[in-house]
Amino acid sequence: MIRDFGVTDVVAVSLYTVVPNAVGAVGLILIARRSDRTGERRRHFACCTLGGALALASLTLHLHSFAAMLACLSIAATLIFAALPIFWAVPTRYLSGNAAAAGIALISSIGITSGIVSPWVIGIIRTRTGSMDLAVYLLAALLALSGVALLVGVKGDAGRRG
């Protein structure tokens, strides 16, 4: 995306790539602290995933401003990064003993599988359509689905610290 705006210098691309990650790291800490302070997980996770999905989808608007694209990417990174530690607090609260071990193993297996499959699917979509838009929409939809699934599928008190 950064190169799509005409930034060709490798060092400049690298430095611009740091921005969403640095903003995301700070946001992760702030949002996770708030979730810990309030003890609320479900809504924090859902807000992060739904907001991250919206920020990702906004990248397909073909923004003509480099700053706007970088801002959308930074917001998406912040919310997606923040969703991860909040998510992992839920299974350990909801499951215990052998169920926790099996549940965490299942979640990890699904995550690893998606890490293998998603680059392949994104590559196929980009090759066939000549654009990343559909791939970004797919990622945004899956991200939103994860937030809704946790919000609907987990009891209200399971997302709270005990």
Segments predicted by a language model, with ranges:
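Short amphipathic helix-loop junctions that connect adjacent transmembrane helices
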Residues: 1-12, 126
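Multi-pass alpha-helical transporter architecture, strongest
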Residues: 140-162
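Residue-level signature of mid-helix packing/kink "hotspots" within the transmembrane helices
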Residues: 21-29, 112-116
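Loop-to-transmembrane helix entry
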Residues: 7-23, 102-106, 134-137
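Helix-to-loop junctions at the C-terminal end of transmembrane segments
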Residues: 27-40, 126
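A late C-terminal transmembrane helix in Major Facilitator Superfamily
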Residues: 94-131, 139
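C-terminal transmembrane helical hairpin of 12-TM major facilitator-type secondary transporters
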Residues: 39-90
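Helix-terminus/helix-capping segments at the ends of transmembrane helices and short amphipathic helices
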Residues: 3, 35, 91-96, 126
